[in-house]
Regions:
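Short glycine-rich His-centered loop
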Residues: 5-47
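Active-site-proximal helix/loop segments of hydrolytic enzymes
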Residues: 3-8, 43-142
């Protein structure tokens, strides 16, 4: 059973699709998109956009977490590409103001080229602890 005092700060990495132009808003120099040649549509004629996918996953997670009784606060813009430091600063400022028990969850997917770079493995979960005491850091990393 979820504690209604627990706040989940939800992050979705990279930018999304502009609702008016349908343009992918992660800067071209960063990439974060791949054209797939496997016949699947994905987001735009075979393109897979990390930031758009991350927002779809974050939205679904928020829906399910709210059903479980968690208070969810998205810290990402619906489509603009804000820096990770901006998103964590937002969560830290809100958490300091309200002083509640919280968790920061960041959703990321990688755009891997099926036709040009076949994948032979998968990535797992990473835990990062920032500005916490040793006991808390050890607990989070265990």
């Amino acid at each position: 059973m979820a504690n209604k005092q627990t706040v989940l700060y939800i992050d979705a990495g990279h930018g999304g699709l502009d609702p008016m132009t349908k343009e992918y808003l992660t800067p071209e120099k960063i990439g974060k998109k791949t054209l797939h040649t496997n016949g699947k549509a994905y987001h735009n004629n075979g393109w897979f956009y990390e930031g758009h996918f991350n927002r779809q996953i974050a939205k679904k997670f928020i829906e399910e977490a709210k059903k479980a009784g968690f208070h969810c606060v998205p810290v990402y813009h619906p489509w603009q590409d804000n820096s990770l430091s901006d998103r964590t600063d937002t969560a830290n400022a809100m958490n300091q103001k309200f002083g509640t028990r919280s968790l920061f969850l960041s959703f990321h997917a990688n755009a891997a080229g099926v036709g040009t770079a076949p994948q032979t493995g998968a990535e797992g979960v990473c835990s990062f602890v920032y500005k916490l005491g040793t006991e808390t850091a050890n607990l989070a990393l265990s």
